[in-house]
């Protein structure tokens, strides 16, 4: 009987110990990332807190739940994303990380949800700007292949792709009609 209670005591203390270890670790931050903001807050169980992101470029949201469990929902379609209307999410019990692509429309809506398992969740979110993505865009913009001259835009292979796509659609329609005929006959 004593081993059962001792095991139960160890299991009940384990989440607190893991939580302590989790908070003491700092996330790895590459040299290309620039810290833009640090946002701290509290959120009640089952509630949302909303933020707006206006920065252009590739943005990394790194959120750590200091107490409880806060989840992260992101969208470029609505400023109030939730678990039904998000484009990106991170709902882990540990650090939540979301990479917002540079081609997302601005402003980007950020929803922070307090998990109902905890009366209150406390979080800290660090907002990073990825300079490496900007450098890659500049390199791509300024590069050209050997058959192009500098300063001229690259030509896409549009007509060939369009013909293949039209042919694929025709085959799909034809196969669909044949399936219907076979289903009627048999």
Curated annotation (Swiss-Prot):
Residues 1-19 form the signal peptide. Residues 142-159 have a biased composition (Polar residues). Residues 141-165 are annotated as: Disordered. Keywords: Glycoprotein, Secreted, Signal. It is found in: Secreted. GO terms for cellular component: extracellular region. The keyword Glycoprotein applies. Glycans are attached at residue 47. Its main location: secreted. It holds the Pfam family UPF0669. Belongs to the UPF0669 family. This is UPF0669 protein C6orf120 homolog.
């Amino acid at each position: 009987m004593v081993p059962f209670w001792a095991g139960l005591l160890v299991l009940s203390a384990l989440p607190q110990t893991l939580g302590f270890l989790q908070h003491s670790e700092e996330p790895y931050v590459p040299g290309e990332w620039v810290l833009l903001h640090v946002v701290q807050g509290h959120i009640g169980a089952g509630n949302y807190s909303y933020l707006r992101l206006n920065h252009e470029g590739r943005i990394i949201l790194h959120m750590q739940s200091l107490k409880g469990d806060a989840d992260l929902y992101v969208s470029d379609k609505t400023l109030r994303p939730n678990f039904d209307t998000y484009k990106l999410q991170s709902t882990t019990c540990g650090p939540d990380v979301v990479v917002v692509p540079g081609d997302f429309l601005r402003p980007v809506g950020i929803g922070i949800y307090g998990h109902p398992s905890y009366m209150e969740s406390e979080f800290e979110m660090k907002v990073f700007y990825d300079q490496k993505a900007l450098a890659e865009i500049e390199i791509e913009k300024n590069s050209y292949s050997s058959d192009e001259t500098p300063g001229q835009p690259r030509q896409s292979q549009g007509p060939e792709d369009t013909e293949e796509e039209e042919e694929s659609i025709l085959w799909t329609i034809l196969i669909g009609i044949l399936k219907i005929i076979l289903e009627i006959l048999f």
